[in-house]
UniProtKB/Swiss-Prot annotation:
Transmembrane segments: none annotated. One of its GO terms (biological process) is DNA-templated transcription elongation. Keywords: Acetylation, Coiled coil, DNA-binding, Transcription, Transcription regulation. The keyword Transcription applies. The modification N-acetylthreonine is found at T2. Residues 50-76 form a coiled coil. The keyword DNA-binding applies. Necessary for efficient RNA polymerase transcription elongation past template-encoded arresting sites. The arresting sites in DNA have the property of trapping a certain fraction of elongating RNA polymerases that pass through, resulting in locked ternary complexes. Cleavage of the nascent transcript by cleavage factors such as GreA or GreB allows the resumption of elongation from the new 3'terminus. GreA releases sequences of 2 to 3 nucleotides. Belongs to the GreA/GreB family. This is Transcription elongation factor GreA. It comes from the Bacteria. Gene3D superfamilies: Transcription elongation factor, GreA/GreB, C-terminal domain (3.10.50.30), Transcription elongation factor, GreA/GreB, N-terminal domain (1.10.287.180). One of its GO terms (cellular component) is peptidoglycan-based cell wall.
Length: 164
């Protein structure tokens, strides 16, 4: 599995997401009991509590599947070992459209990574910008298409392994 096919997480983020998954799984019997209690109230066609409990169960199960998929494809605590190449787990600085006054520094990772200090923006390697930068070397210019259809060019200024 290559670095672009995995989700890079710090140990702290992995532990936080695993705890959330464990809590959701442990909560399954509570939701099932709630559904059963509401079912016993009578006519299901007009039972708002029953439908709300079923909707909550659906949302919870979707989040469980999302977390299981995320954690099964996670590479924990392993920032890229090399500098100068944009990879998941790299802190990168870019110039937009060749304008040195229009720069941004961010982490290429998932939103779930959620850098705790709040000082560093996070772009997914699956986002247009993150995907365009994967495997770029310092000095290289890449282009990507934004949702409105226009093309933006970015030049990689630096790429360093993330350290929390």
């Amino acid at each position: 599995m290559t670095d672009t096919q995995v989700t890079w997480l710090t140990q702290e983020s992995h532990d936080r997401l695993k705890a959330e998954l464990d809590q959701l799984i442990a909560n399954r019997p509570v939701i099932a009991a709630e559904i059963n209690d509401r079912r016993e109230e009578g006519d299901l066609r007009e039972n708002g509590g029953y439908h709300a409990a079923r909707e909550e169960q659906g949302q919870q199960e979707a989040r469980i599947r999302q977390l299981q998929d995320l954690l099964s494809n996670a590479k924990v605590g392993e920032a890229p070992k090399q500098s100068g190449v944009a990879l998941p787990g790299s802190v990168v600085k870019v110039y937009y459209n060749g304008d040195k006054s229009d720069s941004e520094t961010f982490l290429i990772a998932t939103r779930q990574e959620g850098v705790s200090d709040g000082k560093l923006e996070v772009y997914s390697p699956n986002s247009p910008l993150g995907g365009a930068l994967i495997d770029a070397k310092v000095g290289e210019t890449r282009s990507y298409t934004v949702p409105n259809g226009s093309t933006v060019s970015v030049t990689l200024v630096s790429a360093e392994p993330y350290h929390s």
